A protein has these predicted regions:
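NAD(P)-dinucleotide binding in Rossmann-like oxidoreductases
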Residues: 271, 276-455
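Beta-strand-loop-alpha-helix segment that lines the small-molecule cofactor/substrate pocket
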Residues: 134, 140, 145-196
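C-terminal helix-rich "cap/oligomerization" subdomain common to oxidoreductases
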Residues: 2-19, 23-40, 136, 360-362, ...
Length: 527
């Protein structure tokens, strides 16, 4: 039996959670935190959460559990979700008592982010100081640009859920807004790339960067839905760049990719694959083979979740009011609400704009207007770089829709001195020189993304606190706690769009020139 502990991080390196490598799985019990982060701060950060859905509540739970920061406001259009959020995550002292936003929550609950911005501007116009220090943006992906642009002039630190935006133009617009500050000084910025912050991946990065030079690696990301590289795997691409491009030590030079390529297509969810027995049915509720179909929306949302008392994700995605309906009116009423929503469908007379605008959760998977890949490969290549002292390497990423391992990640990394194989629970390191294989069992703290949700939220709050207390400047706090710059956030998203260009054009993309043309040259000149 081998029981080896990793050495402590050297000066300038990221701290790594205490993790033991052993041939037997360690106890799942975790040590209790002695006190909340920033408990000694004279003025812990005050937080605004925009969007009280799954992501907003995940981050709020981490903030409330692990930090001394205070959530003082929430902007959420669904009244039930807003009330529940206030009750769960905001104490009675939240808010400052000047007026009421009309929701019955004082200054704590707002029907939308614009309402909060208007209220905040009114306060400041009256000579009052800012009411919050930072905002978590957890709204729909396509709304990220307008929210971040609306917040930038207020000088708040921002944590935006991934993806940053749904188009390259919107990503560049967010980049410009936060870079230039909308007239305010630049602030700490983070993105919901939670894979960077789990104990598992922090250990994996240390093993990759500290034990051997990487030659090539294969990564797989698997999902049960028809995914896209942007919405489902932008943080996987970020994970690869974090693992293989960004320097492990402060002051080190990043090893930038040289070029990339991609192949992929929609293989399964096409009309040609539709079972003949389904006939002309376009909606699950009117389909003659609904009971035998593994993709039945009625079974997935209703029987598998709602009937078991779960009105949260994914059921509430169909209708955000279902949670309130279930708790106040009971299961029968909630099921009727769900079935009504699932029965909605479009016809040849439905305007194309309405078809694109609505999600149509009950639509037959083979009759939908889905055009995103359910199987895609991306190859990223680095060349020798004398400036950073890095050798050439290659990363191959495979995103697939069908797998037993739902939303889990597996990978194999080949280096000059050994290789690493990992899944969500273990990391195996094989040493070529000794022939010995060690198995590491990283800490499993629970919560979303292997502890990544909690890790991201607490690191962001610590960065905001360090700047607020005057212990660090924005740039230092950004690197120390967030671990990446605003530019690096945008680069990982831009690489997704570059990969899509490569796939559609059946071409190899030169990364430096693509970045210069599609991002740098789109930024407005400095005033």
């Amino acid at each position: 039996m081998h029981n080896n502990t990793l050495p402590a991080a050297k000066s300038g390196e990221e701290p790594i959670p205490t993790t033991t490598a052993t041939s037997t799985k360690p106890s799942s019990k975790l040590p209790l935190r002695p006190k909340k982060l920033l408990a000694d701060s004279p003025s812990p950060p005050r937080i605004l959460v925009i969007g009280a859905g799954s992501r907003g509540t995940a981050y709020a739970g981490a903030i409330a559990t692990h930090t001394a920061a205070t959530i003082v406001a929430v902007a959420e259009p669904v009244a039930f979700k807003r009330r529940e959020f206030v009750r769960a995550y905001m104490d009675d002292s939240s808010g400052d008592g000047d007026g009421d936003d009309g929701s019955g929550d004082g200054q704590r609950g707002f029907a939308g982010w614009r309402e909060w911005v208007a209220w905040e501007r009114g306060r400041r116009a009256g000579g009052k100081a800012a009411s919050v220090d930072a905002a978590f943006v957890c709204v729909l992906d396509e709304q990220h640009r307008e929210v971040v642009q609306g917040l930038a002039p207020l000088g708040l630190a921002v944590m935006c859920e991934k993806p940053l935006a749904t188009t390259l133009a919107d990503c560049v617009a967010i980049y410009e807004a936060m870079l230039r500050g909308g007239g305010a000084a630049p602030q700490v910025f983070s993105i919901g790339h939670v894979l960077r912050y789990s104990p598992h991946n922090m250990l994996l990065r240390r093993l990759v960067g500290g034990i051997f030079r990487t030659v090539t690696g294969n990564w797989r990301r698997e999902s049960t839905t028809a995914p896209s590289l942007l919405t489902k795997s932008c943080h996987d691409i970020d994970f690869l760049l974090w693992m293989l491009s960004e320097p492990a030590k402060e002051g080190g030079k990043a090893h930038k990719p040289a070029f990339l390529s991609s192949t992929g297509k929609l293989n399964f969810y096409r009309k040609a694959r539709k079972p003949a027995a389904a006939g002309a049915a376009t909606n699950c509720l009117s389909c003659p083979i609904e009971r035998d179909c593994m993709f039945s929306a009625k079974k997935i949302y209703g029987e598998r979740h709602l009937r078991n008392g779960n009105a949260k994700w994914p059921v509430k995605i169909v209708n955000p009011e279902i949670e309130d309906c279930l708790s106040t009116m009971g299961l029968d009423a909630a099921e009727n609400m769900l079935l009504k929503d699932l029965s909605e469908d479009w016809t040849s007379d439905t305007p194309s704009e309405e078809v694109r605008r609505r999600p149509w959760f009950g639509r037959c998977v083979w009759e939908a207007d889905n055009d995103v890949c359910d199987d895609q490969c991306v190859t990223i290549t680095w060349e020798d770089d004398a400036a950073s002292g890095s050798l050439a390497k290659t990363a191959q990423f495979h995103m697939v829709a069908f797998t037993e391992k739902i939303c889990e990640r597996r990978g194999r990394i080949y280096g000059t001195k050994g290789e690493i194989e990992y899944d969500s629970a273990t990391i195996k390191l094989h040493d070529f020189a000794t022939g010995h294989t060690e198995t590491f069992y990283p800490e499993q703290p629970g919560g979303g993304h292997g502890g990544g949700d909690d890790g991201l939220a607490t690191q962001f709050v610590q960065a905001v606190g360090a700047v607020k207390d005057g212990r660090m400047g924005v740039e230092e706090a950004q690197k120390r706690f967030i671990g990446c710059t605003l530019e690096e956030v945008v680069q990982s998203h831009a690489m997704v769009f570059a990969a899509e260009d490569a796939r559609k054009q059946r071409a190899v993309v030169d990364w430096p020139s693509w970045w210069q043309k599609n991002v740098e040259e789109r930024l407005p000149p400095k005033a």
